[in-house]
Amino acid sequence: MLVLHIGPHKTATTYIQNNLFRGRRDLARRGWLYPEIGAGGLPGHHDLAHNDARYIEDGTEQAAALNAVAKKAREKGQNIIFSAEGFCRWSPAQFDAFARVMETDMIDLVHVMRDPFDLFYSHWGEEVKQGHSSSLPDRFAEHFNDPLASRRLNPMVDLARLSRQDNLRLHAVPYEVLRARKIDIYTHIGTEVLGLPDLEVSNIKAKNVSFPIEMTEFLRAVTLLHGDGARRLPDGSAMRLRFTRMLRHEDRKKITTLMKTAGRPARRKIRIPANPSYMRRLTKTLMRGMEGCWTIPFEEDELFPMPEEKTFIHYDTYLMMKTPEIVQAAQGFLDRMTVSEL
């Protein structure tokens, strides 16, 4: 059996990958290989997912090494599991090429379904950390004009084409159902997909801890100043790493206080009414599209329950960048980052 856990982002992927990585010896004893190849020393196989041509094109050194891993696993009677969020962006042709390298007729894909509003908010925060400067309302407008056509808001945009592949078998994990029932997502995947009940969970603190909204918006202000208003910085990820390395505990406290006080006039809320029609349509689309693929039985209204209004905080870009205290602090932090780079 060959399994790819494909995310997507912000669906407990780091937690799952850390547990797979920490538990790889126990997995090996129970017939499952979590390979080092394609990981680049990280818990997840991000190099394989994002630089796939090096691994799945005929004649490359990495393709030969990957094929050797597959052959050795078969000789030992082992199954294989890989994990990376980037796999969710692969095309059917990429999965076909990967299957050829691994010499398998079937790949099992594990996809986690999370509430699309919460997922969107988390993903926007991650975008800011990667050098994007777009405001939350701007990103909402881009995707919510036609939510069922959005890859971000409707997983079936990607999964529909994958479900038609004869060599791909989908396993849909309902994130909100597991959370409501207090079921650990790692042990659930172990039991329902890998056939390994009672997997040991490592209580590992995630390294990519999410910023509070005040830190996210302050970083966006730094990005806007650094990029002179550009929508995205090519070195955004590197800048975020410098930002977090320099961020002391007292900096966090000062920035949070600054944004809550001086930035109060720029603070805004996006309100989503309870049980919006989009969510009902999406639920029906997913229930039909993933019929027979769910890893646990549940009622339709459990998939994305939304009995109450959702509220998402953000800061108005114009008002934020017209607040002298915020601009001064952001420029000061940017100057510190620039000096540290020299």
What is each model feature region?
Residues 1-342:
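Anion-recognition interface
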